[in-house]
Amino acid sequence: MARMKARSAKGKRVAKDTWKSKVWYDIYTPQSFGGDVIGQTPANDPATLIGRISEISLRDLTNEHSKHMTRMYFKVDGVSGNNATSQFVGHDTTREYLKSQVRRRRSKINAIVDVRTKDGFKLRVKALVLTAVRARDHHKTEIRVKMEQIIKDMAKETAFAEFVHAMLMGGLGSKIYGDCKKMFPLKRVEIFKSEVLEFGKAVEAPVEEAAAEEVAEAPVAETQE
């Protein structure tokens, strides 16, 4: 019995610590987002990094505290050394923030639009308009149609990076607000979600030591309570 136990102990395999063999890679945003490091991820094989999604808040990326509710998503599309490049694949807004914007005696108007930018990128954009007072159905329809047209027109006239900047930093929302408030009193506009459906021309590869470009915020106009 003792011999059997000895053989068993001798033939037992030692578990390998796979974490020790992993290499950490820095994930960079595209140059249009500053080419900054937004996180690190481990991998045994760099090929397994391709397709991984990294999340960062717009506040952390731009140092704009007012953008804390917006989350951006970047997909790894290349690896060089210990650096992983990525491309923007979409954004969303926290549910808590969206709920906090809805008030009684106001109407909520949603629009979901598939658009294509000047350089061939296809995106699905979701926008929200909150009216200052309750709107009738025909007003809601008119505003929704106008929202969709503005989003399509801006996408068609701009390149991908410029359109994404307008979505995230308020330019698109301000355009919708300015045009639609002529039709009905509005309180707020949010471009609360986007998703890249098809990529157009090659996305520029981030470089390790690129200087971050300052991004000026285009505030969404808002009426007073």
Curated annotation (Swiss-Prot):
SMART domains: Ribosomal_S3Ae. InterPro entries: Ribosomal_eS1, Ribosomal_eS1_arc, Ribosomal_eS1_CS. GO terms for molecular function: structural constituent of ribosome. GO terms for biological process: translation. Keywords: Ribonucleoprotein, Ribosomal protein. The keyword Ribonucleoprotein applies. It comes from the Archaea. The keyword Ribonucleoprotein applies. GO terms for cellular component: ribonucleoprotein complex; ribosome. Belongs to the eukaryotic ribosomal protein eS1 family. This is Small ribosomal subunit protein eS1. It comes from Methanococcus maripaludis (strain C6 / ATCC BAA-1332). The gene is rps3ae.
